[in-house]
Amino acid sequence: MILSSLLPLSLVTLTSAALTYRGADISSLLIEEDSGVAYKNLNGETQAFELILANNGVNSIRQRIWVNPSDGSYNLEYNLELAKRVQDAGMSVYLDLHLSDTWADPGDQATPSGWSTTDIDTLAWQVYNYTLDVCNTFAENNVAVEIVSIGNEIRNGLLHPLGSTDHYDNIARLLHSGAWGVKDSSLSTTPKILFHLDNGWDWDAQKYFYDTVLATGTLLSTDFDLIGVSYYPFYNADATLSSLKTSLTNLKSNYGKNVLVVETDWPVQCSSPEYAFPSDLSSIPFSADGQETFLGRLADTLEDVGGVGIYYWEPGWVDNAGLGSSCEDNLMVDWRDRTVRESISVFGDL
C-alpha cells in the first residue's frame, strides 16, 4: 500500500483497468424496477443500479433492443429511457439490435412482424431503415452511442428464413444494410459496428462464418469495426480459456478487427451443472470470489491477445438468477436482499 502510493499516477493508471470496455448488460433493469426491485450498494444503501456499477469501475452498458415486442419490453422507447440514465451515470451505450420482436440467439432468429420473409430486397431495406431510425432517434435525444451490434449471436444467421445459413449471400446483404443504416445516421460520432457470434472459443465455427460471409463480396471488411463473442464456460467442456485465446487471436489477425467478449457469466451456485466445466477453469470456486477470479483470468486472456473489452451479462436480473443456465445463480447481486456482491468491484481492475 505504501509503495503504490509512491508510484507516479501515470504508472498506477497503466497497471489497472487495461481494457477499453469494462461493461455489463443490464437490459432488464427497468423491468426489475417496475416489479419493485431496489438495489443496494456495498454499504447496504439503496442506490440506482447503474450508479452502483459506475462507482465500481463499469464504463459501458450493453442494451438489447427488440423491434416490436408484444408488451413493449426492450423496444426503442424502453432503451432510450435506459440509455439516458446510463449516459447520465458517465458510461457509454452499446446497442444490441436483435432484429427480432423477441430473443435472437443461435436457435431463434425470427423476422419481426411486418417485415418481409419472402423478398430479400425488401428485407434489406427494412433493416437499413430500422437501424437508421434507431440511431437517429438516439441522436435526436442527444444520447451518444458507442457500439451498435447488427444482430445477436448470428452464427446460424439472422432474420430467418431469408437470412439463414442456407443463404450466406443474404446474410452478407443484411449485415451490410444494417451497417450502413448506422453509418448514414445523424449521430455526431459514428458508433463502432460490431458483429457477434456465440461460442467464442470455437475457432472453426468463427472462421467458417466470417470466411463464408466475406467471400460473397457483398459484405466488406470496412463495413464493421469490432468482432464480439459470447463466452459461457458452463455450456461446453471444450470452452477452455486456452481455446478462447486461440480463437480471439485468430479472429484479430485474420480479419483485422478488435475483439471483445460481449456476454459472459460465472456462477456463485451451480450444484448440478448440465455440462462439465472446462479443465482450465475447474479450480475456480462457485462464489463471488470465483466471479472475481474468473473475470480476472478472462481479462488477462483478452489483454494477451490485444482484446478491448468484457461485458458481464445481466449481473442484476434478480428474477432470473440462473440466467438461462443449469446453474442456480450467476448474479453479482444477492437475489434475496438485492445487495450487490463483493465481486461487483472487480470491474475497476479489469
Curated annotation (Swiss-Prot):
Catalytic reaction(s) noted: The enzyme specifically hydrolyzes (1->4)-beta-D-galactosidic linkages in type I arabinogalactans
SUPFAM superfamilies (UniProt xref): (Trans)glycosidases (SSF51445)
Database matches in Pfam families: Glyco_hydro_53 (PF07745)
GO molecular function: arabinogalactan endo-1,4-beta-galactosidase activity; glucosidase activity
Catalytic residues of the enzyme: 153 (proton donor), 263 (nucleophile)
Subcellular location, principal: secreted
Keywords for this protein: Carbohydrate metabolism, Cell wall biogenesis/degradation, Glycoprotein, Glycosidase, Hydrolase, Polysaccharide degradation, Secreted, Signal
InterPro entries documented for this protein: Glyco_hydro_53, Glycoside_hydrolase_SF
Family as reported in the entry's similarity comment: Belongs to the glycosyl hydrolase 53 family.
Protein name: Arabinogalactan endo-beta-1,4-galactanase A
Species this protein is from: Emericella nidulans (strain FGSC A4 / ATCC 38163 / CBS 112.46 / NRRL 194 / M139) (Aspergillus nidulans)
